[in-house]
């Protein structure tokens, strides 16, 4: 063996050994993150179920929502987290290396429970992303990972918590990689995110966390006429997704402009939600509203339901209450889809499912995740309809999004690099 051949073999052995060690490292740490974040996500699921059932049993708790808001603001001030950037901080940490403090996890855990206990209109997946991102980042700091590896740990944590809480491991694994920079997928995190997501889902399943699944009763044949109807629904959902994003961001801006004091803002915001609840006459639009999604599948919701949920959620989150925006987007999409189906005479349960997924895609700018979550929530039988609707919603929702720190790296309309933040 000559010297050149020997050096080549040594180089390849060293190179492949380094790859093997790196792979083993990520398998080990993704399991750790999956266990920790999955356990926290599972605990959060049960805690949220308890407070939701308690509120449904005692509906008068809604009148204490302003006090709950003051408690949330006080907790964040006590923990010296006055900037309160939430999910946006987790996303920007992957872009810029900002620190995600560990205190974010218990803060969002407790604050979201307070919001739901007293009837704020919010979701839960946003809380899961913050909890998971905080846990992943903290584990990375403990083991002295460099900045790039910490970014992967944050994505692992986000995937794990989302998977445990919502029971969609496929979508959860991809979501954290896709949502950060629209047009660029962080494939470096693929193996860690998949493992973390599956581990977390396994933990949740062990403790009998119920996976969300909605059965579509009747799926019509995929004809040209039906494809036109679904395309029209997707286009309308893109417009509704813009309306939802604008409502959320505008309400926050208006609250801050006219009520600059955080305590006053959250107290008045809580009063607004109480007044809105009294005007409606029920608490259909408080909390997550997951039961309304099932009613939409059955074809029985009020036509104004999607607009009222937008208003309730904007009043709640804009004032400073905590939770997520994703489940409200499911609610809005489902009720709007049901309305479309009832008005056009097209299968309401299918329109509900397509509306739900299309609106999710429009507000998150994540078409691959949207397709995967459609399979996990509704099965594969409606695949052609989801496959057609999602691209329309993605393209026509423009550069709007739930999270201002989300980057649109490549244009939706040209093969050009734009690297701009969402509206």
Regions found by a protein language model. Name each.
Residues 1-423:
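Alpha-helical transmembrane segments and immediately membrane-proximal extracytoplasmic
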């Amino acid at each position: 063996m000559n010297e050149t051949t020997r050096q080549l073999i040594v180089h390849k052995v060293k190179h492949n050994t380094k790859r093997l060690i790196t792979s083993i490292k990520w398998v080990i740490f993704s399991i750790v993150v999956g266990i920790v974040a999955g356990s926290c996500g599972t605990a959060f699921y049960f805690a949220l179920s308890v407070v939701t059932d308690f509120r449904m049993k005692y509906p008068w708790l809604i009148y204490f929502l302003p006090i709950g808001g003051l408690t949330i603001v006080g907790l964040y001030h006590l923990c010296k987290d006055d900037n309160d950037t939430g999910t946006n901080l987790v996303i920007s940490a992957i872009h810029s290396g900002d620190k995600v403090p560990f205190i974010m996890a218990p803060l969002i855990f407790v604050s979201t429970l307070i919001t739901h206990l007293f009837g704020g209109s919010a979701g839960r997946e946003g809380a899961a992303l913050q909890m998971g991102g905080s846990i992943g980042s903290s584990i990375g700091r403990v083991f002295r990972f460099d900045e790039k590896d910490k970014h992967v740990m944050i994505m692992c944590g986000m995937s794990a918590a989302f998977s445990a809480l919502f029971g969609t491991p496929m979508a959860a694994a991809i979501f954290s990689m896709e949502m950060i920079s629209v047009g660029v997928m962080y494939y470096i995190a693929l193996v860690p995110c998949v493992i973390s997501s599956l581990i977390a889902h396994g933990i949740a399943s062990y403790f009998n966390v119920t996976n969300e699944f909605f059965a579509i009763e009747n799926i019509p044949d995929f004809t040209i006429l039906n494809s036109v109807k679904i395309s029209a629904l997707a286009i309308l959902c893109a417009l509704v997704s813009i309306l939802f994003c604008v409502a959320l961001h505008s309400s926050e801006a208006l609250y801050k402009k006219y009520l600059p004091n955080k305590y006053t803002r959250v107290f008045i915001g809580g009063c607004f939600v109480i007044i809105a609840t009294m005007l409606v006459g029920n608490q259909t639009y408080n909390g997550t509203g997951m039961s309304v999604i099932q009613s939409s599948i059955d074809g029985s919701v009020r036509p104004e339901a999607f607009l009222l949920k937008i208003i309730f959620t904007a009043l709640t989150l804009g004032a400073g209450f905590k939770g997520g925006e994703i489940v409200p987007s499911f609610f809005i999409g489902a009720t709007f889809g049901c309305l479309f189906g009832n008005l056009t005479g097209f299968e309401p349960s299918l329109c509900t499912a397509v509306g739900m997924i299309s609106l999710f895609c429009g507000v998150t700018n994540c078409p691959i995740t949207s397709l995967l979550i459609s399979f996990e929530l509704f099965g594969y039988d409606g695949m052609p309809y989801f496959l057609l609707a999602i691209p329309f919603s993605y393209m026509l929702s423009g550069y709007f999004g739930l999270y201002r720190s989300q980057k649109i790296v490549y244009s939706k309309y040209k093969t050009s690099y734009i690297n701009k933040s969402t509206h």
